[in-house]
Amino acid sequence: MSTVGREEASPLLPSTAEPSPSRVTLEEGGVGSAGDLDMVPTRRDKLALASILIGLILVLSTSWYLVFSGNLKEMGWFAVHPPMQSLAITAFLLGITPLQPPPPNSTTKKNRFKTHQSVMLGFALPLLAIGSSAMIYNKYIHGAKHFTTWHGKLGLITVIWVILQASIGAASVWGGGKAFGGEEKAKRVYKYHRLSGYLLITLMLFTIHLAGIHSDWANGRGYTNLRILAYYIGLPLIWLGIEIRSR
C-alpha cells in the first residue's frame, strides 16, 4: 500500500512548521513543490469519492431497510445493531475522506485534521459503541452465546482494534506527541496509524459483508438481490474508492 511510502515527505500530523521549500524538477521540465505533487485532488480522486458515496448509499439504505421493513418488536435490542453499525462505518469513512489526498498546506491540514477528529470522536466511536452494546445486551437477555460466528468474532476484533487505533492516534497528536517521545517520533508512529486505519476499514467492510450475506438473520429476511447489490457491489465500491484516494 502506498499510504506509508510517501509520508516522510508530507506527514499528516498538524504542525506549525510550513512545508519544506525544497523543489523538484518535473520530467516535463517544470518546477513544483515536492509536497504538492500528490496533494491536489485529481479527477481520479473525485471519481473515487463518488464510488465511496454510491457504495455507502447502497449499504446504508439496504441495512436500514432490512431492519425497518421487519417486525421491530420481535427483533428487540437487535434492531439497534445494524442501523448503528452501518452509521458507524459511514462516520469512519467520512472522517477519513477530509485527509484524502493529504492537504497541501499546514492551515488546511490542521482544519481537516480537526474535522477528522471531531467525526471520529463525536460520531463514529459513539455509534459503534451503541451498536455493539445493543448486540451484546440482546444476547445476554436471551441467554445466547457470544461470538459464535465469524461475523461475531471479527466484530469483536474490530471493536478492540478501533479502541487501540483511536488511542494510538490520539497519543500521537495530542500534547505534541509526548507519549511517543516528541513530535518527530510521533510522526513516524502516525504513518503506521494511517496504514493500520486502512487495514481496519478493510476488516470492517468484510465483517459487514459476512453479516449482510451469510448471517442467519439476513438470510431469514430474504431480499437476496438487494443484499447482493449492497454487500457484493456496494462494499467493494467503498473499498476501491478508499484505496484509490490513499497516498
Task: Place the predicted regions along the sequence by residue.
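Membrane-embedded alpha-helical bundles that constitute the cytochrome b-like, heme-associated redox core
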Residues: 2-247
